[in-house]
Design a protein with these regions (language model features):
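Short S/T/G/P-rich N-terminal loop/turn motif that feeds into the first structured element of a domain
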Residues: 1-47, 53-64, 73-87
Length: 87
C-alpha cells in the first residue's frame, strides 16, 4: 500500500469544510482507494492522508491534486510514500 500525504493552508476554512462533501466521494471512488483522512490541524493548516493499494493508484491522486483549480486551500506539499504499518 502507498499513501498520499497532502499538506494545505486554508484560505477559507468554512468553505474548505463544505467542499469536502464533493471531494471525499470523488477520492474514495478512485481506483485502488483503501482509506482517507482529512484533518484540520488549525483554522489555517490541514493535512490529508489517502491510502491506495498501489503506488500507481496513489500517483493518480497526485495528478488530480496538481491539476485541480485553486479553491479554498493552497496546496503546500504532496508526497507519496509506502505504508510501513497500519492498525
Amino acid at each position: 500500500m502507498h499513501a498520499v500525504v497532502i499538506n494545505v493552508s486554508f484560505t477559507d476554512f468554512a468553505a474548505a469544510k463544505a467542499e469536502l462533501s464533493g471531494l471525499v466521494p470523488r477520492v474514495s471512488g478512485a481506483p485502488g482507494f483503501v482509506a482517507g483522512y482529512w484533518v484540520a490541524l488549525s483554522q489555517d493548516k490541514g493535512t490529508s492522508i489517502v491510502v491506495f493499494d498501489s503506488e500507481d493508484s496513489a500517483q493518480m491522486l497526485v495528478g488530480m491534486v496538481e491539476g485541480a483549480p485553486a479553491m479554498s486551500v493552497t496546496v503546500d506539499s504532496v508526497e507519496v510514500g509506502e505504508v510501513m504499518a497500519h492498525a
